[in-house]
Amino acid sequence: MITLGEYIIKKQHESPEATGELSSILGAIRLATKVVNRDINKAGLVDIIGATGVENVQGEVQQKMDLYANDVFKAALEARGEVCGVASEEEDEFVSFNDQRCINSKYVVLMDPLDGSSNIDVNVSVGTIFSIYRRISEPGKPAILEDFLQPGTEQVAAGYVIYGSSTMLVYTTGYGTHGFTCDPSLGTFYLSHENMKIPDNGSIYSINEGNYLKFPQGVKKYLKYCQEIDGPTNRPYTSRYIGSLVSDFHRNLLKGGIYIYPSTASAPKGKLRLLYECNPMAFIMEQAGGRATDGFNRRIMELTPTELHQRVPFFCGSSKMVDKVEAMMEEYSSEEK
């Protein structure tokens, strides 16, 4: 059995240019994950569930666990001294670490410290999403905004953690997507899913159908296509939507399927955040053989961010399913005008 730490070191040795900094950052994330996982498992016993009454920059009421997880990941990353700054869904602005070691470091981290946190009090799976970039500013100085506003193609690593019936960490550094499952008796992550690959086609679609009347016409047509009876294409497909991006994404990655969060009448730019959610998940999905676009044949990772909390439509999953919904989006786009 290979542990996450051993696997990271193994891959570091396979890259002559590696210096160990990225491995150290992943180690910090692993440590923070263990702390958050422990406290999520105690969420009903201690006062860390429920809303704070405070809204984040997106106008969403923050959960107590959101802020706790945010603090845990920030502290773990700052303590390693390999990151000059962090941008988080829970922070209005990026956070610059001004310790001398941090200022001299080459990397920044962007994260959603606790995805799906509103589900905690009903015991539904939640997750953490992260991505790592090389800073573009000069080391030796504090991080700047431009260090974080980079297209997803510049990611050097991305991953997510799902806190479910078992806790699993999935990550990529551009050489495949790999999954590690936590042994709760030891608190150790072991390699359980090496070189994960999503099927080219699937039979699961994940979308909040309660918003159907607000969807673009192409998405409505695709949903009807998914629900039609057709033996040769194994339709109707199965609708599965948890309301936690990490949970829906993880299931579809393993079984084959598509996750859709389109633009709507009430959210014309989409709802998911490009930097904290879409880019890292797109990197993981592409490394597993899938696709991630904005529904209009634009690759998510090629979009140029203009602000930290930018939102985009998100279509992600098995390549043939993404191809199909994109074709329908294009075919029926004229009906939106």
Curated annotation (Swiss-Prot):
InterPro entries: FBPase_C_dom, FBPase_class-1, FBPase_N, FBPtase, Fructose_bisphosphatase_AS. GO terms for biological process: fructose 1,6-bisphosphate metabolic process; fructose 6-phosphate metabolic process; fructose metabolic process; gluconeogenesis; sucrose biosynthetic process. Its EC number is 3.1.3.11. Pathway: Carbohydrate biosynthesis; gluconeogenesis. Binds 2 magnesium ions per subunit. Its main location: cytoplasm. Homotetramer. This is Fructose-1,6-bisphosphatase class 1.
